[in-house]
């Protein structure tokens, strides 16, 4: 039953850390969560509009948010930050202004930092975006999956499982196709597994992409 639970939540506190660090009163908790979601959506939309990468991948691995009384620190982990950093500091200033307008935070300042991750294709979010781009360009799903696995092998991962569900190749009946390389021990809590669930809209309908990457064992 290891696949039934979210692998990130299952390992929280052992091999996985929190992506949002802040505390508030219980009555304001839902507002804080909504604000986090707004910040993440705003950053993703900005990156989508302002970066044109040949592979069609935005390259955001994760966004970490730390909140203090007068400051919101946002760290964007990216696989390909070059297009965004070329506009620096104008690009980051523009993003800070957008976030302040979106969140109506007059009393709080935004501090945005961009960090490049060493092996972009060892991250499931970037890999899922790559597969989504291939599927939109009508590349065969098997070819897209195999190419994605080849890219992760270059990142020295110990195992990967890719699953695509929906009306694959425009077939009438929805089905689930998956492929696995190496070990993916979903039951082992000390196994560091990175996971991503991604939705892609194609001309035939919506497809769901799930990726599990086994990085290391602690």
From Swiss-Prot:
Localization, per the record, is: Plastid, Chloroplast
**What is any one of the record's Gene Ontology cellular component terms?**
cytosolic small ribosomal subunit
Q: Which InterPro entries has this protein been placed in?
A: KH_dom-like_a/b, KH_sf_prok-type, Ribosomal_S3_C_sf, Ribosomal_uS3_bac-typ, Ribosomal_uS3_C, Ribosomal_uS3_CS
- A GO biological process this protein is involved in? translation
UniProt keywords, alphabetically: Chloroplast, Plastid, Ribonucleoprotein, Ribosomal protein, RNA-binding, rRNA-binding
Q: Which residues form the KH type-2 domain?
A: 43-118
Q: How does it assemble?
A: Part of the 30S ribosomal subunit.
Name of the protein in its database record: Small ribosomal subunit protein uS3c
Species of origin: Coffea arabica (Arabian coffee)
Q: The organism's lineage?
A: Eukaryota, Viridiplantae, Streptophyta, Embryophyta, Tracheophyta
Q: What gene, per UniProt, encodes this protein?
A: rps3
């Amino acid at each position: 039953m290891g696949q039934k639970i979210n692998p990130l939540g299952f390992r929280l506190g052992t091999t996985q850390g929190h992506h949002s660090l802040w505390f508030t009163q219980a009555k304001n908790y839902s507002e804080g969560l909504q604000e986090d979601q707004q910040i993440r959506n705003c950053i993703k939309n900005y990156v989508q509009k302002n970066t044109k990468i040949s592979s069609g991948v935005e390259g955001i691995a994760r966004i970490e948010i730390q909140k203090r009384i007068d400051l919101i620190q946002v760290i964007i982990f990216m696989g390909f930050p070059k297009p965004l950093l070329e506009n620096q500091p104008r690009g980051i200033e523009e993003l800070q202004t957008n976030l302040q307008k979106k969140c109506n935070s007059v009393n709080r300042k935004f501090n945005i930092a961009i960090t490049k991750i060493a092996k972009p294709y060892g991250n499931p979010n970037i890999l899922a975006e790559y597969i989504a781009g291939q599927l939109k360009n009508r590349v065969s799903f098997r070819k897209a999956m195999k190419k994605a696995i080849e890219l992760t092998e270059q990142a020295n991962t110990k195992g990967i499982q890719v699953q695509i569900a929906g009306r694959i190749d425009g077939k009438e009946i929805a089905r689930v196709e998956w492929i696995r390389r190496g070990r993916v021990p979903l039951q082992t809590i000390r196994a560091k597994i990175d996971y991503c669930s991604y939705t892609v809209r194609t001309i035939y309908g919506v497809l769901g992409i799930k990726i599990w990457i086994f990085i290391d064992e602690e």
